[in-house]
Amino acid sequence: MDTPTPNITNEALTVRGKERYRSGVLEYRKMGYWEPDYEPKITDVISLFRITPQDGVDPVEAAAAVAGESSTATWTVVWTDRLTACEKYRAKAYRVDPVPNAPGQYFAYIAYDLALFEPGSIANLTASIIGNVFGFKPLKALRLEDMRLPVAYVKTFDGPATGIVVERERLDKFGRPLLGATVKPKLGLSGRNYGRVVYEALKGGLDFTKDDENINSQPFMHWRDRFLYCMEAVNKAQAATGEVKGTYLNVTAGTMEDMYERASFAHELGSSIIMIDLVIGYTAIQSMSKWARKHDMILHLHRAGHGTYTRHKTHGVSFRVISKWMRLAGVDHIHAGTVVGKLEGDPLTTRGFYDILREDYNETRYEHGIFFDQDWAGTRKVMPVASGGIHAGQMHQLLHHLGEDVVLQFGGGTIGHPQGIAAGAMANRVALEAMILARNEGRDYLAEGPQILNDAARHCLPLRQALDTWGEVTFNYASTDTPDFVPTAMPAY
């Protein structure tokens, strides 16, 4: 019996009950990348994009194009699609909402089958989600606002080796934020003078000091000298205070071999923590996380470079997404904003970053910029770090906005103290202890904060001097990244 000839039309060819398009260029929505009735599976990776189509480009077609270009599509129909389970592997845009008060911008929800991604690889995930699609001409701008990572995918990553609870147990410090300071000036000090700064700050009351993002191994100070002098300072400060202390030794370098060498030397010297920069890349971050886990060390990540793609509201990647990726990658610390400091940080948006890093389960909170429930499936928590333009006079605000599971990094607010580094450290420690005591007594420490600090300063001259020096310093600039969200009653396309 002859096989019936398939019904051929000008637009499509039917083969075994499936629709296959002729060669040529078709709209993405007609190629299967727009499915408004699609119900995401529990195992799907879901991305929320803010899309700004070019003039005349339909937002649904733009969303379908993003789905296609971030998964299986190219600019024309290819017959080799039929050699794959293309219906499974195509990403599916299933919802498009206008962004409130932002004409021409839309939130596009896109689901990806889990089989599209290599287990345990941030590099592979990002090659699709933020790959070529970000240069796509039909879009004026594209921003990845949030992601829902399924448990089946989360469990392919180790996550932080230490996490908040274990770090506190190692330090034997509970019930308050940890205190730190970045050594200043960040560049130019000799190894010996650098070590003196570390000792004075730790002896004065801080828990940590740290290298800044761009101190590696320059002509004025070789990395090995810095490590030696810093660890000598840590050991002396521990002996003088009876407390566990630490300093973040930046092992960032030009090659993985150099980073491993520096990390190994820090481990030999007895350091409990090493530091890397975000700019080393996702694969290098995961590699250093694996090394830190093997050697039982805390891994601190400085988010150097993030502002190049997280700060612009319509194009790039939100830092809430970077926070999720870094929790998967396995860092123990990450800089996550201060709210009141000198760096970009809308209060509600910043709280959303902290929620992602510190909660076992993130519930949808549109006001914090969190668009999806996220189950971390037992992945350890990341300790957020607040740094950049903060000082003792803001202690009540910092505690209110950021909570107690955070490292407060007072760089200039320690080293710039008029009576010296140790006095600056003491001022910060006394301010923190006074605020924690007020909180534990049930006082409204946010409203009473200035009075609490002034009362404590009556018995602590360094705190009095800190308040007199910086008490009126603020950085009140409008944030460029605020949590736009779609009310549940707003109709979708």
UniProtKB/Swiss-Prot annotation:
Cofactor note: Binds 1 Mg(2+) ion per subunit.
Residue numbers carrying N6-carboxylysine: 210
Molecular function terms from GO: magnesium ion binding; monooxygenase activity; ribulose-bisphosphate carboxylase activity
Reported cofactor(s): Mg(2+)
GO biological process: reductive pentose-phosphate cycle
Chain residues that bind Mg(2+): 210, 212-213
Binding site for substrate: 132, 182, 186, 303, 335, 387
Disulfide bonds: none
Enzyme class: lyase
Keyword annotations of the record: Calvin cycle, Carbon dioxide fixation, Lyase, Magnesium, Metal-binding, Monooxygenase, Oxidoreductase
UniProt keyword annotation of ATP-binding present: no
A Pfam entry, by short name: RuBisCO_large
Family affiliation: Belongs to the RuBisCO large chain family. Type I subfamily.
Role, per record: RuBisCO catalyzes two reactions: the carboxylation of D-ribulose 1,5-bisphosphate, the primary event in carbon dioxide fixation, as well as the oxidative fragmentation of the pentose substrate. Both reactions occur simultaneously and in competition at the same active site.
Full protein name: Ribulose bisphosphate carboxylase large chain
Gene from which this protein is expressed: cbbL
